[in-house]
Amino acid sequence: MSQTVHFQGNPVTVANVIPQAGSKAQAFTLVAKDLSDVSLSQYAGKRKVLNIFPSIDTGVCAASVRKFNQLATEVENTVVLCVSADLPFAQSRFCGAEGLSNVITLSTLRNNEFLKNYGVEIVDGPLKGLAARAVIVLDENDNVIFSQLVDEITHEPDYDAALNVLKA
């Protein structure tokens, strides 16, 4: 199965399907800014916001990290995981320069399966191999309680919808 999103108005194909509310999140291991492996299970008992995007070096992606850094202070027992294919060095540099300390950046550097398993792998077009823009919210038991695959990659996600699920 696949889905279609758009990049600058042009259709691009995304492999698989984003997890839907009510489904169980798949386990994953990604790379932290210190190059250590970080697993989903390390956040057991906390709610998770997965802010998934192509690259921190684009304006819209950077804006989403800044916004989720701010929103992270508004919800309890919640971690915000910002996931991209960027090298951990770039993620760390960006967050350090911006003074962002309420989000955790994770890289798909050693795990391209994450993109496939979470239905965000762009498989054609100029962004082939990167992640489509998506937000997935998990409860304390890793059940999906909200997901959004953003139709136009150059647009920001629906922050209010994700926040409302966490405040419900």
Swiss-Prot record:
Its EC number is 1.11.1.24. The active site is at C61 (cysteine sulfenic acid (-soh) intermediate). Disulfide bonds join C61-C95. InterPro entries: Redoxin, Thioredoxin-like_sf, Thioredoxin_domain, TPX, Tpx_CS, Tpx_Peroxidase_subfamily. PROSITE patterns: THIOREDOXIN_2 (PS51352), TPX (PS01265). The active site is a conserved redox-active cysteine residue, the peroxidatic cysteine (C(P)), which makes the nucleophilic attack on the peroxide substrate. The peroxide oxidizes the C(P)-SH to cysteine sulfenic acid (C(P)-SOH), which then reacts with another cysteine residue, the resolving cysteine (C(R)), to form a disulfide bridge. The disulfide is subsequently reduced by an appropriate electron donor to complete the catalytic cycle. In this atypical 2-Cys peroxiredoxin, C(R) is present in the same subunit to form an intramolecular disulfide. Thiol-specific peroxidase that catalyzes the reduction of hydrogen peroxide and organic hydroperoxides to water and alcohols, respectively. Plays a role in cell protection against oxidative stress by detoxifying peroxides. This is Thiol peroxidase. It comes from Salmonella typhimurium (strain LT2 / SGSC1412 / ATCC 700720).
